Amino acid sequence: MNSKTGAVDPSTHAESPAALACADTPAMGCVAVEARESAAARAQLNRLMVELQDVRKQRDEAFRALEQAHQETLFRLARAAEHKDGETGAHMQRVGAFAAMIAEAMGCPPDYCEILYKAAQMHDIGKIGIHESILRKSGPLTSDEWRLMREHPRIGASILAGSEAPVLQLAAEVSMAHHEHFSGAGYPQGLVGEAIPLSGRIVALADFFDTLSIDRCYRKAHPDAKILEMIRERRGQQFDPRVVDAFFAILDRLVLAREAINAAEEIADVTESDGDWCLIF
């Protein structure tokens, strides 16, 4: 600054546009120039921030669309596995509904119940890797055939593994654990008690209740009275006692849900369910 004129010395601020503009300007005028440039810089920064937010929004929307497409593809694959086994999508929906309702009765958070409703429907996705001659065999399986059949939980878990989506992570857990027994006599890992993930313990009972109530190529459907007797007998052995108790506490609701799904055949795609599943059942 020149002590006599009050002007900025250009030689000491050569890199500053504001300084150059103010070289022959009184001090108050220099401040005004700098204020205008500062306001312009802030406005440009604000525009850049808005543009960045738009880019992030577009990225997030694209990611959600990709994740949704991935989930839908796997859900369709699970349906293909059901059809391969002679089932329809209604079995998947019933198991999903039963599992979510049992989880709710056990005091699980609503978000968990909603995710489980979707994840449980993919419990048998691994059957896509089992030959139809085994899945639809009318007689007893040979030891080799049974060994192959017991691999479907691992196959399903491997198909579903690696996703960051909570529903697919839980579906992988369900696939691997839904044939474990509380006593440790199940497969594929022989887990015991609470070492079995809760999702697997719940879906094990939901699947058992539904599967025995429908005709299969190797047996006729059991009446409900017989199925309920079997569940009571297997409490603490095949099934977690807490899960069994929750099941019987809401048995009337489960039966109504089954009737609703059967009547409609299919209520909706799991991919279209965005919450409040409990309002459906």
PLM regions with names:
Residues 4, 27-29:
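Generic short amphipathic/hydrophobic targeting helices enriched at N-termini
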Residues 2-13, 17, 22, 36, ...:
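Metal-dependent catalytic cores of enzymes that make or break cyclic nucleotides
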